[in-house]
Each structure stands twice: as C-alpha cells, then as structure tokens.
Amino acid sequence: QNGQTGGSSDGSQNSDSSGKSGGSSGTGGSPRPASGGLRVSGTMLTDASGNAVQLRGVSTHGLAWFPEYVNKEAFETLRDDWGANVVRLAMYTEEYGGYCNGGDKEALKQLIDDGVSYATELGMYVIIDWHILSDGNPNRNKEEAKAFFSEMADKYAGHNNVIYEICNEPQNSDWNGQIKPYAEEVISCIRQYDSSALILVGTNTWSQDIDAVAGNELDDDNVMYVLHFYAGTHKASLRSKLESALNSGVPVFVSECSICDASGNGGIDYDSAQSWLDLLNDRGVSFLAWSLSNKNETSALIQPGCSKTGGWTEDDLSETGRWFRKAIQG
C-alpha cells in the first residue's frame, strides 16, 4: 500500500459535508454529518476526524439524456427520504450527445456545476464521472480527459465534497499497460489544483478486474479503485474478487451497481443482491445505485410512467428503486 494514512486534512477545508459511518444501520433520514474531506485509510474511507465513512447513494443516468433529474428537490429527496449522502453525475464521453462526440460541452458542464451546487448546499458528496463506455480504452480521449479534469479541479478546488471518477468502465485495457499510465496523467492534472480530493479509478472489463491492482497501485494516497456489479450477472466469483482485493489492502469503491443483469435490464436477483449488500456493509464499502431515471428498464429507479423529478413516493419507484431506497437507508 502506498503509505495511505487517514485523518490528515491535507489542506482540505473543514466545512461540513456529510458521511455515513461504515455499517451503520437504522439511521433513517439524514446521514451522520462528517467533517471535511474524505481520506483513504487502509481500505476504508474516513472523514477529516478519522471516522470511518461509507457513502451510499445514487448515480444519474447520462446527463445529456436525463438532465431533468439534476435538481435540488431530487437530491433533497434522496438525502432526506432515502438517507443518501452522495450523488454521481454520469457524463458519457463517446455515446450520443457525449462530451467527446459532438455533445454540448457547455451545457454538460453547466449540469455538473448545478449538481455540485445542489449537493454542496445539501451537505452531500458528489462524484464527477467521466463515463467512458463504448470508448473502452481510456486513452482514446485522454487529452480531452486531462483538459476536462484540469478545468474541474481548478473550479472546485475549494470544495471538499467533490470526488473525481476518471474512467467509468474500461474494457480490453490492461491495468499496467493502459489504465494505470492514463490514471497517472489525469491524476497529475487534478493534483495541480487539488492536493487532497478523493479520486476513483475504473478497472478493466467494465470495472471488474480489481485483482489486477494488487501490487500495482497508483502512487497517490487518496485514490480508490472501482468495482461495478449487476447482481443478476455478477455473483460469487466477483464477490470473492472484491474480498481478495480488500484483503490485499486495495481500497475499493462501488460507484455503480444494480440488482438486475449487466444489460441494466432483465429480472431482479434478490438473493445475489442481498449477498452483495451484506458484503458491502460488512466491509464498509461505499456504493451507488444505477440509475436516477424513469427509463423503461429494470435498473431505472423511477417507474417509467412517473414524470416527477423529485419528491417521489414509494409508488413512484420501480422495484429496483424500492429495494435500493431500503438498502441506502440501512
């Protein structure tokens, strides 16, 4: 492990943000406030006071496709009714309307700015997600990524609640040969402006190959490595990969997951979902549910017929939404 120590404030401000203590249950509404920026300590996240923190929350769908869910009422509902303490802003890079594919960059950056503002006002953490998908090798749009994260880190260096996720789901990209060198370059851009922000790095095979990180970690003491799972597809073998990584001292963050199959559709596997949830809570691993949308697919948290963009009742939520609301509430 690269000398990771928790509790050092490292220049992070101490304005209140919010965090949920690892494995806490029954906290209901608002999560326990945490002080200051997040630090990696061993495999755990800690707040500026050194208390263990588990983030639990929700990811948007693509910002270009479902921008209406980036609003204060939506985030407030997630915080107060679901008990969420983090929201992830998923900005696709290569898909239709994507940042690197002719999308409206200024509109996308404005949505991110709105999302950061609402989260900050509500005392929540917020993840800025460079959502690579069809561009499976993160180096494909590396220069764009470096410029984007330099701009974001410069803009939000005064915030201690902003988390940077630099490559959502790499594929066919070797950790040592492709992803790690990319991460080193992008992280150095962020660190020019912000020495202490938490940075999340995706892993190969749609962020499943976290085993490749052990012994090959990045030389930065506030990085976590990303695992994504869809409980209908990913079961015991991926859970054991997670446990092995944690046991090797690799800090893991689940920035996206759901309880259906990996297409985001299909049936729900409640048994596998519960096994995942038990493991995440047992090990204090942070997790975010995909996705805050009413898309007609199993993983969407809102019913397809519901046009409300906040203030949802249980009846407005899909089966997946109801399950995650309880999971996040603890």
Short names for language-model regions:
Residues 59, 91-93, 130-132, 168, ...:
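A mature extracytoplasmic/lumenal domain signature
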